[in-house]
Amino acid sequence: MTTEQTKVIHTSKSKLNLELLGLATLFALGLLSRLDTSLITIDMSKYYFTWYRYIRDSGIAVAFQEGLMEYTPAFSYLFASTTLLDSVIPKVTAIKLIPITADVISTYFVYRIVRIKYPRGNKPYWAAGVFFILPTIFINSAHWGQMDALYTLFIIISLFFFLKEKPLLGMLAYALSFSIKFQAIFFIPFLVILFLKKKIPWWQFLLIPTVYVVSCIPAVLLGASWQTVLTIYLGQSGKYRWLSGNAPNLYTFVPNEYYGPGLVIGLIVAFCTLAAWIIFTALDKSDLTRERMVLLALISVSLTPFVLPKMHDRYFYPADVLSLIVAFYNPNLWFVPILFQLSSGLAYTVYLLGTSIGLVKIGAIINTVLIAYLLAYQLSRQVSSIREAS
């Protein structure tokens, strides 16, 4: 072996060691960021702790009979399971284990999705490591104790199966997401596009209500009424009278005194905008490549909460996740996840740190520019495909 060959081998080993060190550091930081679960927010003490104590002391059957919890049965079963750890760990930690566990599983599926794009190499590991350390991800789960990671996990799994051309499993995963949180509807425009592109047969959409109804059966057997479990989402939609719950979207600029007309106009604007985007995308005859699929999935979960009224500060969480995947599939969009982190992070600070609502408006401006750019990018890609075909 020559001296030059020896140098090349040593250089390669050094690069590999540095890469392994970098990956280990990312995962270690992600783990450390989730060790402190002591923060107790108003939502945690007002709702979660009340439900936790009631289920622990009276049982989940009584909780269902009295309609205590304001979430779906699927979520309620998971939440009730945390009381089994009552003698082992503090209730705040037990509750936060749900989204933290979802973070870990999501990390694996982010790896799997990026591995589809890169069958060889370390980029999938980097994608997983970066995801695990994204600020809005670990803050949402380990510190805030919210459950956005749970329904988003099944959106990620759904996207994975669609990329693998297994639509039945993709729709099943989505149905589970919808059975947990209504915010799963942000993914529906993407599913409609797949249907119009003949990637999903119509009958598979029946899985959504079927899985939801099946998930309700144990709750009904425990004493809940069918009317209660089937109208949970209707009740949630009318709970708050505001156009924007500090969401960095269009409605943060509209005074809440215009709630009535603003809600009606907002719903019309949202429907027309999403319908126009779906039709425009469906009419494109170019191949639906995996790169395009992840881009369309991101636009779906970012455009939908952007144009819908009554959104909350955390509702761009799926966009925070999918934007990272998009950056690995389309490296020239590397800045997109950074900007989504910034806009979502600014919105988080109002609730968690008591900062000015003006920061949400800055986040809304960032999202306006970002979503407009993504739509323009989609258009440019479609035009390029048409030119190549001709």
Q: What is each model feature region?
A:
Residues L26, G30, Y111, P124-F160, ...:
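Membrane-embedded helix bundles of polyisoprenyl
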Residues T2-E4, T37, V229-N249, I279, ...:
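Transmembrane helical bundles and short interhelical boundary loops of multi-pass, membrane-embedded
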Residues L18-E19, T107, I116, Q236-V307:
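Aromatic/glycine/proline-enriched transmembrane-helix motif characteristic
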Residues M1-S33, R115-I116, P124-W126, T289, ...:
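Start-transfer (signal-anchor) and selected internal transmembrane alpha helices
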Residues P73, V88-Y108, Y259-V269:
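Loop-to-helix entry region of an early transmembrane alpha helix in multi-pass inner-membrane enzymes
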Residues G22-F27, K199-V220, L339:
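Hydrophobic alpha-helical membrane-interfacial segments at the cytosolic entry of transmembrane helices
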Residues M1-Q5, F186-T210, L221:
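Perimembrane helix-loop-helix junctions
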Residues S38-R53, E66-L78, R241-L250:
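Extracytoplasmic catalytic/substrate-binding loops of multi-pass membrane glycan-assembly enzymes
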